[in-house]
Amino acid sequence: ADHLKEGDRLMLKAPQAVVAPRLHGRGGFAANPDYLDADLFTRRFYAPAVKLLHGHLAGIVFEQEYRRAAERDPVEDEAADLERFFRRIPADRRYHLELRTEAYLAAPVFDVLARLGVGQALSHWTWLPSLAEQFARAGERFFNEGGEVLLRLLTPHGMRYEDSYAKAHPFDRLVDGMLSQRMLDEAAAIMRRAVDAGHHATVIVNNRAGGNAPLIAKKLVERFRQDPATDTV
């Protein structure tokens, strides 16, 4: 925090110790007894982060890892658990939920986000549908009470983490055939929709989305500056 300058903004990820229903240990994956523990999140993460970062804290992302069908609760139960958790932690306009299980991109969960003002983090990730499809399933609504719209450009569709890492390494250039033009088109269109609606759009770009995050960001800015009539969302 001592090295942050005025205007610097940080997005933090909530710890998997609280957000993940299962954790990997020496014996493989096991149920996490602290899953959605509101008190643990507040004492061990939220309170220290707010105290340390003050106004530099722009948001907290609750990244829900992908769950296979056999490991997944019904969407209604998941929505109820999420609502219970978000109601028990300190009220804050900087929360965003990233859902990596397509089955949870559904009305019961979106209704919770709408009621509580928690943002939907739109993520371009291995097993998720397109950014435009995620946005459409939410009724093309922006939920975050603080007016922040968050997009994460992480991996190409259908490509696992380790494969995208290996293909992008050493992260010093754009890799031929890796960067999705559709991803750029849809991200730019959603950014424009957000700005036009009076929101602030934040995009987090990973090297694994195409080889080099700064160059991907440059491509996205160029696409954003094009004629809105060419938008795809």
Language-model region placement:
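Residues lining hydrophobic/aromatic ligand-binding pockets adjacent to catalytic sites
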Residues: 1-233
